[in-house]
């Protein structure tokens, strides 16, 4: 009688472990998908912000360029055109971010760094572990208890 009971109990435990493993895997997959979607939404917001900024800055740049050019012609001082140079760099950067290939180039550079420069990505003192977190937590709680 005990043998039959323990056999069914072992089978039940095995099924329970498989279910828990499958459940943990599903939870991890959901978490990874959620993080990926959050990252995509943040990137979409960044691109949308850049495009919106470009509209306002483009208008400002156009008005500034016309005004500075008119001032340089009227006063016969080409020095009035100097502010157009840094403003054009900002305009070009924002256009490249919003409509160009800046994000693809940055992604490619990041992939290259991940492949060829792993040593630069190492955390100081190595990987964070459960033990290091517990040690810091205990030290911090001891600090608050002593005071």
UniProtKB/Swiss-Prot annotation:
Q: What is its main location?
A: membrane
How does it sit in the bilayer?
A: Multi-pass membrane protein
Looking at the UniProt entry, the stretches that span the membrane are: 53-73, 79-99
Q: Name one Pfam family in it.
A: DUF2368
Q: Which UniProt keywords apply?
A: Cell membrane, Chemotaxis, Inflammatory response, Membrane, Plasminogen activation, Transmembrane, Transmembrane helix
Q: Which residues lie on this side of the membrane: Extracellular?
A: 1-52, 100-147
Q: Where in the cell is it found?
A: Cell membrane
Those parts of the protein on the Cytoplasmic side are: 74-78
Q: GO biological process annotations for this chain's record?
A: chemotaxis; inflammatory response; positive regulation of plasminogen activation
Query: Hey, what tissues is this thing expressed in?
Result: Expressed in peripheral blood cells and monocytes. Expressed in adrenal medulla.
Q: Which domain of life is it from?
A: Eukaryota
Return the InterPro entries for the record.
Plg-R(KT)
Q: Which GO terms describe its cellular component?
A: mitochondrion; plasma membrane
The entry describes its oligomerization and partners as: Interacts with PLAT and PLAUR.
Q: What is this protein called?
A: Plasminogen receptor (KT)
The scientific name of the source species is Homo sapiens
